């Protein structure tokens, strides 16, 4: 269970990254890219960023593009946040929406 401070930092990182991703010029990062969750380590050194993409066929390419733009995003995030350390960003595909839809369909059609 993350502490209250870590929870607030996660929300702030999520909000800032959602805005920053729109400024990425990489052609692989296109369409509707949503930051669904952020999980930061207690020492604030690493942050796992869960992203969801509207077009499911491009998810792997979008994640590669975000990893490529990770240095830019980390630098801009450091400028926006007032933290001692700017966490190293790790982008991960979020499949919780698909999993939830699958479970819901199983409940509807047993």
What name fits each language-model region?
Residues 1-46, 52-110:
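Charge-rich, low-complexity N-terminal segments
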């Amino acid at each position: 269970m993350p502490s209250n401070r870590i929870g607030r930092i996660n929300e702030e990182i999520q909000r800032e990254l959602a805005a920053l991703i729109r400024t990425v010029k990489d052609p692989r990062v296109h369409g509707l890219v949503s930051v669904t969750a952020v999980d930061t380590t207690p020492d604030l050194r690493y942050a796992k960023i869960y992203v969801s993409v509207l077009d499911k066929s491009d998810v792997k390419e979008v994640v590669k593009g975000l990893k490529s733009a990770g240095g830019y995003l980390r630098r801009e995030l450091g400028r926006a946040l007032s933290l001692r350390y700017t966490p190293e960003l790790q982008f991960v595909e979020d499949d919780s929406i698909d999993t939830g839809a699958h479970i819901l369909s199983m409940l509807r059609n047993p």
